């Protein structure tokens, strides 16, 4: 199964992430965001970061998850290439782990920096057992 794909969006980047579960789709969404910034296959898993978020709804939970990851890039130049997510829909909470390392210009390709997550065109759906997350990131 394809984990994610990109779609054209004026001045920003659109992402469609897929998963066999909601958790896997959230993991794919995070991977796609970092793939915009670098080749995630070159990221080693030297650092583990734990993230806990509470959302008002599923869209807000996705927004908070991606924004939290971007804060680590903005503050510590951390790039992530692997994720593990657990979601409690009853309490609308997310517990996640992100694995990666600090950006190294000699090792990591510098692509487009993602500035922020947005709610623009955000849609979370399920089709034939596949969860689909569609959203736009600001670059």
From Swiss-Prot:
Protein family per UniProt: Belongs to the archease family.
Keyword Transcription: no
Residues holding Ca(2+): 12, 138-139
Membrane-spanning residues: none
tRNA processing is among the record's keywords: yes
GO terms for MF: calcium ion binding
Keywords: Calcium, Metal-binding, tRNA processing
Top-level taxon: Archaea
Name assigned to this protein: Protein archease
């Amino acid at each position: 199964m394809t984990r994610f794909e990109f779609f054209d969006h004026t001045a920003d980047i659109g992402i469609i992430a897929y998963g066999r579960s909601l958790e896997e789709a959230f993991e794919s969404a995070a991977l796609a965001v970092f793939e915009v910034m670098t080749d995630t296959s070159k990221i080693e898993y030297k650092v583990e970061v734990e993230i806990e978020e509470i959302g008002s709804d599923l869209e807000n939970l996705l927004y908070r998850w991606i924004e939290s990851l971007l804060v680590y890039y903005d503050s510590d130049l951390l790039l992530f290439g692997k994720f593990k997510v657990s979601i409690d829909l009853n309490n609308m909470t997310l517990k996640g782990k992100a694995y990666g390392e600090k950006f190294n210009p000699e090792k990591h390709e510098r692509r487009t920096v993602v500035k922020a997550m947005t709610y623009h065109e955000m849609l979370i759906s399920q089709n034939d057992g596949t969860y689909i997350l569609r959203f736009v990131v600001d670059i």
